[in-house]
Each structure stands twice: as structure tokens, then as C-alpha cells.
């Protein structure tokens, strides 16, 4: 086996790389964003590849979009009689091709987590819903936290700050005098709403 891929049934197959399956269950063809999709089995972007793929990429030509397409590389593997296995995702999968998709996926993940506290929550903090607070992080007095929310390690949520819902905050983040919701704040950020 030279590759394994994850497939998922989608409602809008024209927007994805699609796998066409033979009657024996093997992959017949992989097509990137076809105008007339033969199936609704999207290639999810999760691959298990052998070093053989590098040799394929060295011979690959840019697509009509002027990109080297992984689907084209997988198709070359098939055309050269290499074996590609696949597995179907039967539970949740979300394409994260746009910022809106990433925010939505973040919301879904947060909604399925349970609260924990490994940091410090001072007095006079209003907490609503599920909150995951990382090691050495502090939520200061005078803040409002609306879950679901996750706060990484070594972060500080200062007074006069409202955070959440549906927000992921990375490590080493400081939030002060601001209101943030439906967001993903990466590591090492400082957000100060003071003017």
C-alpha cells in the first residue's frame, strides 16, 4: 500500500477532491473539484503516505489552478498501478478551507469538551457554561467568561474583559479591557482594548 486516505460523504461534492470507487471497492479515480462528480465521497485532506509520493510529486505538473494538487499525485499513484486504501469517516467531519469553517469547527469541538481548571480563578469572576483553564493561567477578578471556552497555559484574562462563547485562547496570551467571542487567539498574543 502506497497511500491511505480518509473519505467522507458530502452534500456538495463539486467543492472537493472526489474518489470514484470500483464495484470491487477499490479506488478507480481521484478527481479534484469535478464539474460532474461521479460520487459524493470527498477526499478529506487526511493522508497516510509512503515516500513514493515524493517521487510522484517530482514529476507532477501544475493544475489548471497553477497548483500542485495532492489529488493529481494520488491519481498518478493509481495510474501507475500503486495501491491506495481508504477509510470512510462516518461521524463528524468539517472542511476547514475558510476562516468561517475554522470558527465553526472550533465551536463544534468546544461544545463536546468538559470543564477543567488547572489555573487560578480569582473571586468576582462570572462564569457561564463550560470552561477549560490551562496550567498557570489566571482569570482575574471583574471578568466574565462565557463557555464553551478553552484557555491555554500561562495566559492571563485581566479585569474588565468578557470572553466567549466559542473561543479558544492559546498559551501565553494576555487579554485586557476587551470583549472577544467566536474566535481563536493564537499563542503569545496580547490584546488590550484600551485606547
Label each region the model flagged.
Residues 26, 51-52, 58-195:
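Left-handed beta-helix
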Amino acid at each position: 500500500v502506497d497511500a491511505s486516505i480518509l473519505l467522507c460523504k458530502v452534500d456538495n461534492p463539486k467543492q472537493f477532491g472526489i474518489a470514484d470507487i470500483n464495484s470491487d471497492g477499490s479506488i478507480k479515480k481521484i478527481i479534484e473539484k469535478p464539474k460532474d462528480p461521479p460520487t459524493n465521497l470527498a477526499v478529506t485532506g487526511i493522508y497516510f503516505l509512503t515516500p513514493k509520493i515524493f517521487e510522484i510529486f517530482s514529476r507532477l505538473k501544475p493544475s489548471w489552478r497553477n497548483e500542485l494538487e495532492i489529488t493529481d499525485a494520488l491519481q498518478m499513484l493509481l495510474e501507475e498501478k500503486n495501491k491506495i486504501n481508504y477509510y470512510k469517516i462516518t461521524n463528524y467531519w468539517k472542511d476547514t478551507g475558510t476562516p468561517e469553517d475554522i470558527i465553526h469547527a472550533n465551536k463544534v469541538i468546544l461544545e463536546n469538551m468538559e470543564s477543567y481548571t488547572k489555573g487560578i480563578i480569582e473571586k468576582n469572576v462570572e462564569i457561564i457554561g463550560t470552561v477549560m483553564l490551562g496550567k498557570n493561567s489566571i482569570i482575574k477578578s471583574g471578568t466574565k467568561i462565557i463557555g464553551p471556552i478553552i484557555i491555554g497555559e500561562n495566559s492571563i484574562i485581566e479585569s474588565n474583559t468578557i470572553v466567549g462563547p466559542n473561543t479558544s485562547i492559546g498559551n501565553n496570551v494576555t487579554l485586557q479591557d476587551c470583549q472577544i467571542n467566536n474566535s481563536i487567539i493564537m499563542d503569545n498574543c496580547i490584546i488590550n482594548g484600551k485606547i
